[in-house]
Amino acid sequence: MAKVEVVNKDNFKELVLDSPTPVLLDFYANWCGHCQKLLPLLDEVAVDMDGKINVMKVNVDENRDLAQKFEVKGLPTMILFKGGSEVDRLIGFMPKDKIAEKVNAKI
């Protein structure tokens, strides 16, 4: 994949829950400064971990139901899904190497 895909309520099941590849899903908002700082790092993670994980993002303002379903309380929140289930949650901005370290520990 090697790029960050956009997820919404219509394609969430197909792209995240039914994915045979683990998915790192970033819950973000356009008004969130830390979210905007994180986006280019996630682009790099998508390239660096291509074939190991799919990196996706969901705008919480446009997909409030998904944010509520997964009890997203702060932004950015990244949830790692494997086999359709949440296996880890990363809250707040963090450097690329820390994201990769946490993801690699769970996949």
Named regions from a protein language model:
Residues P20, Y28-W31, G74:
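Short pre-active-site segment immediately N-terminal to redox-active cysteine/selenocysteine motifs
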Residues P20-P22, K37-V58:
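Conserved helix-turn-beta segment immediately C-terminal to the redox Cys motif
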Residues F27-L41:
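Conserved redox-active cysteine motifs that mediate thiol-disulfide chemistry
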Residues L66-L75, I79-F81, S85, F93:
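Structural alpha/beta surface segment adjacent to cysteine/selenocysteine redox centers
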Residues N8, Y28, N54-M56:
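Conserved Rossmann-like nucleotide-binding pocket used by diverse enzymes
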Residues V4-V23:
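A short beta-strand-turn-helix
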Residues K82-I107:
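Non-catalytic, surface beta->alpha helical segment in thiol-disulfide oxidoreductase systems
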Residues V60-L66:
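Structural microenvironment flanking redox-active thiols in thiol-disulfide oxidoreductases
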